[in-house]
């Protein structure tokens, strides 16, 4: 059985445990609601974050075959990250008034769900400590795991806040957009939970103290930033069929890497055009912004950024004293370098 199928098996086991949690007396209706909500929101993505906990742990263990227990526990931690992601996305979609997610309507758009989705988000968040309690309570690193998830959740919610208050309607001001602001949003909103958390889970399970791995955290945050810049680029220049969504960063007045880069190199004339059309939902405005991006050769600017970042990350990774840790970081970098989706 391949790793992904094994990973899915663990999902069904965890789901079944949550639907029979002794702390709450379920009715048939409530059990059915939670089950549908979980199936709709948790396992639908690429599962990269979750699977990389298993990968990373195996590499840290020198690549030797994992025991059944190790596979189960690393999978359970991987699913905790997927639960965290589901919780963020369900609430995020309500805040952004989004239409689709992973090729289906956002959960709150499903008939009968509506704003019940807000409570479903809270439930998803509360499932994480239930899973951790059931499977890790006896472990020496139990408190470290709770701490780690709490801290990363706080960082992500704070990153989301910066993102939201930066794009408040009626306060649209492009001049406040800069590389430092872009990096701050990305670091907190995406990099901690998508890049640092999976590796941190593997390190904790392997008996490592996270305080000794600040350098690893910094490299992963840089990698997360690089990943988000790719995302910003693909939002505009990627093919919707390939990336699985239609990009709306321009319409949404997002603090995208592209607009920040554009602001650094525009003439006064071009700047006026950008200020006038960025953040407008009409097709003509979006087209004008995209044409400006082409004129400024942001595709070339991105290609330069991509190769420079790649070299810089590789150099940082190779400076790490532990070969296993290097291998974990290199496998992460290989997965995202020059990705198309």
Swiss-Prot record:
One GO BP on record is: cholesterol biosynthetic process
Recall the GO molecular function terms of this protein's record. Answer: (2E,6E)-farnesyl diphosphate synthase activity; dimethylallyltranstransferase activity; metal ion binding
- Functional pathway: Isoprenoid biosynthesis; farnesyl diphosphate biosynthesis; farnesyl diphosphate from geranyl diphosphate and isopentenyl diphosphate: step 1/1; Sesquiterpene biosynthesis; Isoprenoid biosynthesis; geranyl diphosphate biosynthesis; geranyl diphosphate from dimethylallyl diphosphate and isopentenyl diphosphate: step 1/1
Q: What does this protein do?
A: Catalyzes the sequential condensation of isopentenyl pyrophosphate with the allylic pyrophosphates, dimethylallyl pyrophosphate, and then with the resultant geranylpyrophosphate to the ultimate product farnesyl pyrophosphate.
Segments spanning the bilayer are none
Q: Which InterPro entries match?
A: FPS1-like (IPR039702), Isoprenoid_synthase_dom_sf (IPR008949), Polyprenyl_synt (IPR000092), Polyprenyl_synt_CS (IPR033749)
Which residues participate in Mg(2+) 1 binding? 92, 96
Positions binding dimethylallyl diphosphate in this chain are 101, 189-190, 228, 245, 254
Q: Which gene encodes it?
A: FPPS2
Q: Which family does it belong to?
A: Belongs to the FPP/GGPP synthase family.
Cofactor names: Mg(2+)
What is this protein identified as? Farnesyl pyrophosphate synthase 2
**Enzyme kind, highest EC tier:** transferase
């Amino acid at each position: 059985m391949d790793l992904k199928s094994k990973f899915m098996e663990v999902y069904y086991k965890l789901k079944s445990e949550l639907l029979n949690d002794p702390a709450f007396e379920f009715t048939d209706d409530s059990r059915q609601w939670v089950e549908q909500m979980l199936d709709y929101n948790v396992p639908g993505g690429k599962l990269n974050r979750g699977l990389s906990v298993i990968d990373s742990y195996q590499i840290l263990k020198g690549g030797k075959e994992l025991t059944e227990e190790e596979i189960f526990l690393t999978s359970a931690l991987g699913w905790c990250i997927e639960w965290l992601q589901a919780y963020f996305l369900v609430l995020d979609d309500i805040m952004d008034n989004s239409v689709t997610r992973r090729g289906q309507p956002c959960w709150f758009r499903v008939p009968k769900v509506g704003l019940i989705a807000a409570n479903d988000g809270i439930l998803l968040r509360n499932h994480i400590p239930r899973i951790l309690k059931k499977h890790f309570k006896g472990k020496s690193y139990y408190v470290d795991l709770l701490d780690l998830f709490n801290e990363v959740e706080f960082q992500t919610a704070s990153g989301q806040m910066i993102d939201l208050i930066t794009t408040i309607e009626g306060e649209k001001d492009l001049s406040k957009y800069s590389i430092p602001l872009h990096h701050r949003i990305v670091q907190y909103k995406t990099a901690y939970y998508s890049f640092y958390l999976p590796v941190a889970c593997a390190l904790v399970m392997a008996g490592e103290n996270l305080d000794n791995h600040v350098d690893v955290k910094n490299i992963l945050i840089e990698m997360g930033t690089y990943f988000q810049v790719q995302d910003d680029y693909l939002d505009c220049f990627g093919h919707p069929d390939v990336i699985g969504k239609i990009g709306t960063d321009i319409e949404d007045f997002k603090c995208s890497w592209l607009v920040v880069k554009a602001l650094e190199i525009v003439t006064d004339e071009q700047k006026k055009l950008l200020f006038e059309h960025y953040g407008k939902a009409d097709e003509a405005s979006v087209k004008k912004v995209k044409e400006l991006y082409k004129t400024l050769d942001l595709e070339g600017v991105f290609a330069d950024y991509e190769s420079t970042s790649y070299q810089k990350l590789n150099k940082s990774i190779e400076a790490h004293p532990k070969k296993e840790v290097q291998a974990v970081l290199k496998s992460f970098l290989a997965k995202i370098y020059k990705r198309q989706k």
